[in-house]
Amino acid sequence: MAELTALHTLTAQMKREGIRRLLVLSGEEGWCFEHTLKLRDALPGDWLWISPRPDAENHCSPSALQTLLGREFRHAVFDARHGFDAAAFAALSGTLKAGSWLVLLLPVWEEWENQPDADSLRWSDCPDPIATPHFVQHLKRVLTADNEAILWRQNQPFSLAHFTPRTDWYPATGAPQPEQQQLLKQLMTMPPGVAAVTAARGRGKSALAGQLISRIAGRAIVTAPAKASTDVLAQFAGGKFRFIAPDALLASDEQADWLVVDEAAAIPAPLLHQLVSRFPRTLLTTTVQGYEGTGRGFLLKFCARFPHLHRFELQQPIRWAQGCPLEKMVSEALVFDDENFTHTPQGNIVISAFEQTLWQSDPETPLKVYQLLSGAHYRTSPLDLRRMMDAPGQHFLQAAGENEIAGALWLVDEGGLSQQLSQAVWAGFRRPRGNLVAQSLAAHGNNPLAATLRGRRVSRIAVHPARQREGTGRQLIAGALQYTQDLDYLSVSFGYTGELWRFWQRCGFVLVRMGNHREASSGCYTAMALLPMSDAGKQLAEREHYRLRRDAQALAQWNGETLPVDPLNDAVLSDDDWLELAGFAFAHRPLLTSLGCLLRLLQTSELALPALRGRLQKNASDAQLCTTLKLSGRKMLLVRQREEAAQALFALNDVRTERLRDRITQWQLFH
């Protein structure tokens, strides 16, 4: 085939130039498969095949691709005919050597946007795959506008454009590149303080950190979210590499001249602050674009607390040439170029709402909103882009200045469950998809009908740094109330800090829940708050806030943190307590969810109850209790704790307990 001969010649040119390209095959299954095999036979290489189905020898499923990161391949196939895993697509592109093709298999071009996407099961909260027209239209726009990508469609003439030759590229030898060399000199002479190195993936951040460690006269300690991710750093650091996990380092009294934190944005900020304060010099490295999330928000929030921070950026790629067409296309397709906050939005702020259909009529506006949200939130990923474009129940507001987006708010519909399903969620018998806050209000609150109410949860909110402290965030929340009809409440779930809570409080939210363990992503306890919009919403917020006040002392003792509520010293078992205790004793409600009422039960009961008292009053570990009580493990311990709660309730009032048991047991029969 003349096409294959031309592609063979072009591949040799790409290798000389140090670039990679995308080749799209769009058509029926048999046609795509046949042409992929012809490409594989004509162009020697590894031909890694990413597909949910094992269609080839060198096969890997999209979900298992993370296990291959750090390795390199020549040529790969990404099968997106039944679903498009955007993060896997981006990750695959990062494994390809200079001179490689990424062959993207797509359905028939005209049918693609109406075809259900199996990947939507991961992010849409729908029981079945849904069509994703906005993402498909966006991807089509990017592909057809990209003169460097090759689009080969079934029943369409194939033509290979003439690509202007680029300058020859010479791969890195392992020695520091000029950009790295200059940065190393600055770091070597840096006075005590904190330095942050940011870069897109493949720029040599980890290599730079390792080279610094190998050159300094003193000692260095390396920490990172996972030791496995520091292999490159260790290779360049040589014998001076010493790794200690973040939590272990904090618990130790280790000292060193330098602390090097690889992928610092993935470490909880409170933990990172404590670590940085212990060492005279700290180097933080983090990724500012990519499939694992953006580190721009990390720079904004964390590094802003260090006024004399030394900031550096690596821009030159190491493993392929600058301006690689594949890297450029993936970045545009998955919107990796987040807002860099270099331009200040001018003029008065105007709040307006928009829906997902704007991706069709005016894609630039939602694109800018996504870039703002991505730049401000570290954990924004391609999954969020897909959800924003096509998941049901998504709503948006923008705060627009004269020339730029100054702020954005992303809301998600929640609640509206049937009475029977809400009761089953409360009892711990069911846990359907989605409805983060609505389900938590039922599963962790004391109202079995909480999830029947309709709410709208704040998924993301961001304001441009140059326009903060002007009330724009409050304006966005007020706009959400104005544009929202027939709902019971707005809700938010966030990693609790005093500063964040003051913002939500000023917006009118009522605190209704505090978690009982720190989240790994934030290092904070999860807090949930409601802004009532109906009488039913107001009653729910008041009831849950009252419960939080009653449980405040117990939670503070358990967490070691004072709650921002006025605590009530009330040891009398209420009707709500009785219902919740029965939910623990006779259903599947978690132990710590019922912490407050269980402690009140222990104060009221005269029974021994060793499994409950040992855990909640004496703070014995599960392992200690299992040994003492001769139980085989945690599951049996929890069974014993439920049995003890039932014994205590029957001893207090057997008739009432039996009535509650029968009532709650019925909720398990819901299908």
Located regions from the model:
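N-terminal pre-P-loop "Q-motif" helix
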Residues: 2-10, 171-191
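Conserved RecA-like ASCE P-loop NTPase motor core of nucleic-acid helicases/translocases
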Residues: 20-28, 38-52, 196-198, 218-230
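Conserved lysine of the Walker
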Residues: 32-33, 205
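N-terminal accessory nucleic-acid engagement/regulatory domains that precede
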Residues: 65-162
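Conserved coupling/interface region of RecA-like P-loop/ASCE motor cores
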Residues: 125-175, 303-342
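Conserved acetyl-CoA-binding loop-helix of GNAT-fold acetyltransferases
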Residues: 207-211, 460-482
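Terminal substrate-recognition subdomain of acyl/acetyltransferases
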Residues: 248-250, 258, 270-271, 277-378, ...
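Conserved beta-hairpin
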Residues: 393-412, 419
